[in-house]
């Protein structure tokens, strides 16, 4: 089945919703994707679409995510000839804000290095730096404390991306320490703060 087009037809500016593109990666915190999407949809004026990595799919059921969800296969199924849409470009044009939650250690390293080998990292590599991009690191404490992690987070901040810091708690593996994704309420509040700064959305 051909995926639904990511870019809706033009609508009057007063009906234009603020478009949030959620990226989800292969951290166990991806378990919270259905809750995160649900809470975002509770915010008046938000429209949500999800881009997932293949590994992230291990942690949630697509049936529990009540919005359009794209993965790597969609990029290739939609493009057959030169005139066909390029999904990662269409998505970066469609979105007003990108939220990567969770951002696992693997994808953090890719983004910091400019690697774009799946749909999500291609969207990020093509991202319009005039638009906000929020990221929520999530990984085991031992991975979080590796010196590379601080360097890579700093690189993302240098790009202009905004970190929603991880928190300290008992992790799924049983360890206690930093590395857990920020609470859903914290993430949604940050999105709302960005939304409040964009009272009028320019029609794209």
Curated annotation (Swiss-Prot):
Pfam families in the record: Flavoprotein (PF02441)
Keywords attached to this entry: Coenzyme A biosynthesis, Decarboxylase, Flavoprotein, FMN, Lyase
This protein's name: Phosphopantothenoylcysteine decarboxylase
Top-tier EC class: lyase
Purpose: Catalyzes the decarboxylation of the cysteine moiety of 4-phosphopantothenoylcysteine to form 4'-phosphopantotheine and this reaction forms part of the biosynthesis of coenzyme A.
Active-site residues from the entry: 173
One Gene Ontology MF term: phosphopantothenoylcysteine decarboxylase activity
Pathway(s) served: Cofactor biosynthesis; coenzyme A biosynthesis; CoA from (R)-pantothenate: step 3/5
Residues that bind substrate: 140
Species annotation: Mus musculus
Underlying gene: Ppcdc
Listed InterPro entries: Flavin_trans-like, Flavoprotein
Binding site for FMN: 53, 104-107
């Amino acid at each position: 089945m051909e995926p639904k087009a990511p870019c809706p037809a033009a609508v009057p500016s007063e009906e234009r919703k603020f478009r949030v593109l959620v990226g989800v990666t292969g951290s166990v915190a991806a378990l919270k994707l259905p809750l995160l999407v649900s809470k975002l949809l509770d915010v008046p004026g938000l429209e949500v679409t999800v881009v997932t990595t293949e590994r992230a799919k291990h942690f949630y059921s697509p049936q529990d995510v009540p919005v359009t969800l794209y993965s790597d296969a969609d990029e290739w199924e939609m493009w057959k000839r030169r005139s066909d849409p390029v999904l990662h470009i269409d998505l970066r044009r469609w979105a007003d804000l990108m939220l990567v939650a969770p951002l696992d250690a693997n994808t953090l390293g890719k983004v910091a290095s400019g690697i774009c080998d799946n749909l999500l990292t291609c969207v990020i590599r093509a991202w319009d730096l005039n638009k906000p991009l929020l990221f929520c690191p999530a990984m085991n404490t031992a991975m979080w404390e590796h010196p590379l992690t601080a360097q890579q987070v700093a690189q993302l901040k240098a790009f202009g991306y905004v970190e929603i810091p991880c928190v300290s708690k008992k992790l799924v593996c049983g360890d206690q320490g930093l590395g857990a994704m920020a609470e859903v309420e914290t993430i949604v509040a940050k999105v709302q703060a960005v939304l409040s700064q964009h009272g009028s959305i320019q029609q794209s």
